[in-house]
């Protein structure tokens, strides 16, 4: 007989999921000032995204995403967390 309890899987440990981290307020401020933009002008990620949920991201946060790249070694992008 199967158990009805659901297992929680940490998808952030999968090799194809890049590292996601929430920027501290001062880091986020420095980033948008350096880029000369408003946070909302960054590409968006929904708070309901599985990785955003797993790291506890809330609307208004900025997430730094670090991907491994065979060409550059590392590629860094940023996402603004929106409701949804």
From Swiss-Prot:
Any single Gene Ontology cellular-component annotation: cytoplasm
Compartments it resides in: Cytoplasm
Top-level taxon in the UniProt lineage: Archaea
Keywords: Cytoplasm, DNA-directed RNA polymerase, Nucleotidyltransferase, Transcription, Transferase
EC number annotated for this UniProt entry: 2.7.7.6
Alphabetical list of SUPFAM superfamilies matching this protein: RPB5-like RNA polymerase subunit
Catalysed reactions, semicolon-separated: RNA(n) + a ribonucleoside 5'-triphosphate = RNA(n+1) + diphosphate
GO molecular function, one term: DNA binding
GO biological-process terms attached to the record: DNA-templated transcription; transcription by RNA polymerase II; transcription elongation by RNA polymerase I; tRNA transcription by RNA polymerase III
Signal peptide residues on this chain, from the entry's feature table: none
Enzymatic class: transferase
PANTHER family in alphabetical order: DNA-DIRECTED RNA POLYMERASES I, II, AND III SUBUNIT RPABC1 (PTHR10535:SF0)
Function: DNA-dependent RNA polymerase (RNAP) catalyzes the transcription of DNA into RNA using the four ribonucleoside triphosphates as substrates.
Entry's family note: Belongs to the archaeal Rpo5/eukaryotic RPB5 RNA polymerase subunit family.
Assembly description: Part of the 13-subunit RNA polymerase.
Protein name as it appears in the record: DNA-directed RNA polymerase subunit Rpo5
Annotated source species: Sulfolobus acidocaldarius (strain ATCC 33909 / DSM 639 / JCM 8929 / NBRC 15157 / NCIMB 11770)
Gene from which this protein is expressed: rpo5
